Amino acid sequence: MKNKKWKRFQVLVGDCYDNLATLSENSDCWQQAFELLKEIILEERKTKPGVASELEKLEDETDYAYDISGWLEDCLDEMDMREEYEILLKMCEDLLTLFGWPEYTGSDLKMRKVFALLSLGRNQEAFSYFEKWLKKEPENIAAATAGIYACIATKDFEKGQELIDYFILNPNKCGNENDIIFTAASKFYEATGNKKAKKQIDKALKAYDEYLEKYFSEMDDLEFDDEDKFDIDEDDLPFD
């Protein structure tokens, strides 16, 4: 892609990170960069209809020069942090429409959409979206997690419990692949007043947190030891 507007996009991206560094309350540069990115892609597709059909292909076709995926994640995070939920919802919908998302991909975007809808009080809409998503991807734990939050908001506790029972096979074993749904289950049991089930889930979450803390502490120690190994004084060398 040799669209001259990429230079303008790059400048706007720089403005976005300056915006972060200075804690500016103005989010215009993020929205401007997002809209310009859409504009560039749609312009390219006028002459090359199949260009950038997926986000990963866009990165490849721009030689990974702009870290578009990384910037988009930061952009969505920023809208979320600023509680700009209408803008966040629109961005998620635009990205889900702009690119192709094969099954079991785009889960982060779809979860963000559900949470944006819930934050806007559009609970039934969030519930309906999660149901359609889970129907297409019945083993997607991200869809189920989003669904549990939607069930809490709509007070559909029967459906929420069904999701927990199906996706949490062992309530005592929380790990990297299912910690998000354990967190959702904890919120669910808090909402339903099931103290016994919440205590069991929270115990598993705590055990996993302690495991992670120990793991990263040991990794830090190993890195420190490795640095010491290579910190050799010149006088200790066997020869000049």
Annotate each PLM feature.
Residues 1-46:
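N-terminal alpha-helical scaffold/docking segments in eukaryotic complex subunits
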Residues 65-173:
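Alpha-helical adaptor scaffolds
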Residues 6-21, 62-81, 104-112, 179-187:
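Amphipathic alpha-helical repeat scaffolds of TPR domains
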Residues 45-50, 102-105, 138-146, 159, ...:
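Boundary/linker segments of alpha-helical solenoid repeat arrays
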Residues 23-30, 85, 123, 157, ...:
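TPR-repeat structural position
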Residues 42-65:
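Acidic, Ser/Thr- and Gly/Pro-rich intrinsically disordered linkers and low-complexity segments
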Residues 60-75, 118-124, 155-163, 186-201, ...:
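Alpha-helical linker/edge segments of TPR/alpha-solenoid repeat scaffolds
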Residues 34-42, 162-173, 186-213:
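TPR/TPR-like (Sel1-like) alpha-helical repeat modules
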